[in-house]
Amino acid sequence: MALSSDYFVRGISRTNNNPALQLDLHYTNPNGFVAGAFASNTRIDPGEPRDVELSAFLGYAWNFDDAWHGRVLASHYAYPWNRAGSHYNYDELDLDISYQGWLHFSAGYSPHSPRFVAAPYRELIGVSEQSAEVSAQRQVFGKLSLLAGVGYSHLDGPKSGAYTYWSGGAAYDLQSVTLALGYVNTSSEAKALFYNAAASGQWTGTVIWRF
């Protein structure tokens, strides 16, 4: 469970720069099967009331050797109570390769990621999105870890485009609770694709409780 001052996905706010309460449940078995569910409040369109994002995922994890690990996930995201109906819903396929658990290389694809287009639609439409990201979380002193990441996302459809996003911060573990502080930013191209939802040098604070 987590409480965050904002909910960012690839540098884009899904809560209109408002706090988010989130719940994540996951299951793994020795054969590599992975499954789980995630829930968060959202407000993708500032003109809409607050909504809830519900997602479920299935996947498989494996080891290349003692240091390198892989995982592939297929996820479905649903926003059941928004006025746009199923226009928000989308699916995503993600591949993650990690080194010793602290360095991650990931790639994702969605055939119908939601994006608002002013003309000629003036509504959310589903467009294909391809993304790639490198991220790291490294323990540096005691229970203190440093975090950093950089990624690239390309969206097709009308007025297609691409942008980069990056973040940095620190996390401190207190047994079952983690406190995190981060900085999120995006390139100027993100504003043309997502308007005010794109991060522009924002700080975020998060409290994570594991049970």
Please tell me what each predicted stretch does.
Residues 24-26, 57-59, 73, 94-96, ...:
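Outer-membrane beta-barrel architecture
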Residues 138, 168-177, 183, 197-211:
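Outer-membrane beta-barrel "beta-signal"
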Residues 3-9, 29, 39-43, 62, ...:
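Transmembrane beta-strands of outer-membrane beta-barrel pores
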Residues 31-37, 66-72, 101-107, 138, ...:
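Repeated loop/turn-to-beta-strand initiation elements of outer-membrane beta-barrel proteins
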Residues 17-21, 50-54, 68, 87-93, ...:
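Residues that define the transmembrane beta-barrel architecture of outer-membrane proteins
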Residues 16-69, 209-211:
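Glycine- and aromatic-enriched membrane insertion/assembly motifs of diderm outer-membrane
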Residues 84-155, 183:
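Detector for outer-membrane/organellar transmembrane beta-barrel domains
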Residues 9-16, 46-52, 82-89, 115-123, ...:
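Outer-membrane beta-barrel translocator domains and adjoining extracellular loop/strand segments
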